[in-house]
């Protein structure tokens, strides 16, 4: 990622309180409240992995909420070192979303937050397969939403940002997942929409229900 990646990390150097303020201003609800609504069935000792944890702000918020078994992978060393300094009790390692270095079903929750939007369409199915493989129960996401896949120019660069219906992609790719909850979050100042979604894996595929 080089200098571009470092600039991304520096732009996203937020505290959980600052993140809550950002969400409140943009969506009219805090990130903490969304987390509480979506994770109410997830115990605080659940093993949770964030794929693409950057500086660890999402994990730090989960830690403040009482979650104690936190893990993260991040491909960029600059961001990872800062995440480790903020989260000394979490297990954070350098790795790619294309090849998560953990066993099948190792985590109770695997999640992304603003990460799938940066995965090239040609790699998206593979990344989703890795997320699905490592989760034994829950897949949680917060990503840009669009009913149709679309590329978005990103700070003067092409082929770096896309939006689509990521929850639907999971449902179409995996027969054993059920969409438990989704909230479409409309921006207060423009027409953009983001989506938070929670999917559950079922050992018996007959129990899985998606749209």
Residue ranges and their predicted role:
Residues 111:
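A conserved beta-strand element that flanks and buttresses the S-adenosyl-L-methionine
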């Amino acid at each position: 990622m080089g200098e571009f990646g470092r600039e991304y990390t520096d732009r996203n150097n937020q505290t959980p309180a600052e993140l809550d303020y950002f969400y409140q201003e943009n969506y009219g609800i805090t990130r903490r409240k969304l987390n509480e609504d979506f994770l109410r069935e997830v115990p605080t000792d659940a093993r949770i992995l964030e794929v693409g944890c950057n500086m660890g702000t999402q994990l730090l918020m989960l830690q403040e909420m009482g979650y104690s078994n936190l893990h993260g992978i991040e491909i960029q060393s600059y961001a990872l070192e800062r995440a480790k300094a903020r989260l000394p009790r979490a297990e954070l390692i350098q790795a790619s979303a294309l090849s998560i270095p953990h066993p099948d079903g190792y985590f109770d929750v695997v999640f992304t937050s603003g990460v799938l939007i940066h995965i090239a369409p040609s790699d998206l199915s593979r990344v989703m397969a890795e997320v699905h493989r490592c989760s034994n129960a829950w897949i949680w996401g917060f990503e840009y939403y669009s009913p149709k896949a679309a590329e978005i120019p990103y700070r003067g660069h092409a082929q770096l940002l896309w939006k689509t219906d990521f929850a639907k992609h999971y449902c179409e790719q995996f027969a054993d997942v059920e969409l438990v909850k989704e909230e479409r979050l409309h921006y207060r100042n423009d027409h953009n929409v983001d989506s938070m979604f929670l999917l559950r894996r079922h050992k018996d595929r007959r129990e899985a229900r998606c749209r």
